[in-house]
Amino acid sequence: MKVAIVILNWNGKAMLQKYLPSVVRYSQDEAEIIVAHNASTDDSLQWLAKEFPKVRTIVLDQNYGFAGGYNKALKQVESEYYILLNNDVEVTHHWLTELIEEMDAKQTNAACQPKLLSVYNKDNFEYAGAAGGFLDKYGYPYCRGRIFENVEEDNGQYDTNSEIFWATGACLMIRSKDYW
């Protein structure tokens, strides 16, 4: 498929139970969904096989951490685009279409991310990445929608696409050719 959504999982059965249904519901027609098990010791692998048999699994022989786990898993995935998605992200209708359209339209972009809203208060941005990030003149990272520990309410102020310096790994779409 053109898009592979790869969810790195380590003992995250509860997160998969809560958030994977939205990924399957809103993505299965447009993407291959893959859960990469980073040496999980819970029964998330068995649960996944029973509840979502069409979701592909990659089983890693040890826990390689976040970056290492994704690197090992993505070597086993063939797709034009990768989406790295945390197992605690709930997606919504059309989320994937908009990302694909953005990347297809701007061939010079290596990656993009959507706005991320908090699962606890859907009117506020998510702390982990909000709406993309920048560096200030001192090299300190900050993101649209969050300054230090304070997150903004989403009032549509970041609905316009813009260039960012960094994107969060919580939900990152990247061209596979640029990843490697």
PLM regions and their residue ranges:
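Glycine-rich, basic loop-to-helix element that forms the pyrophosphate-binding segment
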Residues: V59-V77, N87, E98
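A recurrent flexible, glycine/aromatic-enriched loop bordering the glycosyltransferase active site
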Residues: K137-C143, F148-I174
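Short beta-strand/loop segment that forms part of the nucleotide-sugar
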Residues: E30-A39, I58-L60
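Short aromatic/hydrophobic "clamp" motif used to bind/position activated sugar donors
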Residues: Y82
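Short, acidic, metal-binding catalytic loop of nucleotide-sugar glycosyltransferases
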Residues: P21-E30
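Cell-envelope/extracellular polymer assembly enzymes that use nucleotide-activated donors
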Residues: K2-A4, E32
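A conserved acidic beta->alpha catalytic loop
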Residues: S22, H37-Q46, Q62
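Conserved donor NDP-sugar-binding/catalytic core segment of glycosyltransferases
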Residues: E90-Y140
